[in-house]
Amino acid sequence: MSVKMKKCSREDLQTLQQLSIETFNDTFKEQNSPENMKAYLESAFNTEQLEKELSNMSSQFFFIYFDHEIAGYVKVNIDDAQSEEMGAESLEIERIYIKNSFQKHGLGKHLLNKAIEIALERNKKNIWLGVWEKNENAIAFYKKMGFVQTGAHSFYMGDEEQTDLIMAKTLI
């Protein structure tokens, strides 16, 4: 069992797009209407949007490979790329997406540790993320990894307003 990571570049756009759609759809389709899923996937993961994100110097994506097969990725943001105003001392983990077939292999922990490594390299004092209040597995994982809920914000899945919990962890 080998685990490797690779920083994504613009050349990885198609792979990133396919992986994003697959993992998001597999995770959330049972709890959301097909119309809202379609609207969100088309908005969040269209080619233009992902090109913009990949080109942003304040965002980074890293693929994770398990036994040489792509299994998921993490996206982190600093400064003005953060989806909420959390200040210069914070790093946001915007996405940790792992294919269903690769879950329960410790890959989420690897991706989270990569985010922490980046935060520490950049002298960030905190890391934070938003997680859907109904995503109980993810919430339990983040709590186990030392995150605490610090607030909440609205997240729109198509035309449906949902609540994301803001969870944070102090690093320094």
From Swiss-Prot:
Phenotype seen when the gene is deleted: Cells lacking this gene display release of repression of protease synthesis and sporulation in glucose-enriched medium.
Protein name: Spermidine/spermine N(1)-acetyltransferase
Site feature location: May have an important role in the acetylation of the polyamine: 142
Entry keyword set: Acyltransferase, Sporulation, Transferase
Its job: Involved in the protection against polyamine toxicity by regulating their concentration. Could also be involved in the negative control of sporulation as well as production of degradative enzymes such as alpha-amylase, levansucrase and alkaline phosphatase. Catalyzes the transfer of an acetyl group from acetyl coenzyme A (AcCoA) to an acceptor substrate and releases both CoA and the acetylated product.
Gene: paiA
Native source organism of the sequence: Bacillus subtilis (strain 168)
One term of GO molecular function: diamine N-acetyltransferase activity
Signal peptide (from-to): none
Family annotation (Pfam families): Acetyltransf_1 (PF00583)
Gene3D superfamilies: 3.40.630.30
PANTHER family reported in the protein's UniProt record: N-ALPHA-ACETYLTRANSFERASE, N-ALPHA-ACETYLTRANSFERASE 50
Subunit structure: Monomer.
Catalytic site positions: 142
